[in-house]
C-alpha cells in the first residue's frame, strides 16, 4: 500500500513540476479614452423617446402582425416592422470624433432567443410563442445580437452661430435601423402579447 501511495505522490509531483515549467507571466495593457460626447436622441414616426441625454428610453410600436406574415427563422424577410430613424444631436461634444456606434446588450434586457441567437427574446410578460424580435440595419440585413454586431454612422459636423454670433462647430448623426417580429424555432407560432427590452450604448470613435 505504501509503495502505491508513493507512486501516486511521485506522479503528482512530476505533474506539478511540468505545470510550473510551462507557466509564463504576462501583462495585459488596456488603452482607451473617456470622451465628453453626450448626444441626445430623437426618433422618427413609430417611436417615443424619453429621458435625458445619456439615459434615454425609446419606446417602439411594432403593431399587430398576423402569424402567417412573420419572417422565416433565418430572419431574411421583414414582416411589417417599424423604422427606428434615430437622430443624434451631440452639440459641441463631438470634437475630434468621426463615428458613432449603436451597441446592443440583449443579455441585460429580455435576453437572446434560444432558437435563433440573432433575435431578441420576448419578455416574461409576453404570451406569444415561437416569435422573436429582429433588428435590421439600413441595408435590410438582420443583425446577430449574440455576436455584438453594431449599427454604425458617421458623426457629421456643421458650423452654426452661437448666442454671441461666433462660429461654432456642432455634431450630429443619423442611425437608421428597423425592428420586426421574426418566426423563431420549428414549432408553430402562437398569438399573444409580444414585448421585448433591448438596452443599448452609444460608443464614439
Features from the language model and the residues they span:
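Mature extracellular/passenger domains of Gram-negative fimbrial/pilin and adhesin proteins
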Residues: 2-6, 19-205
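Bacterial N-terminal signal peptides
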Residues: 10-16
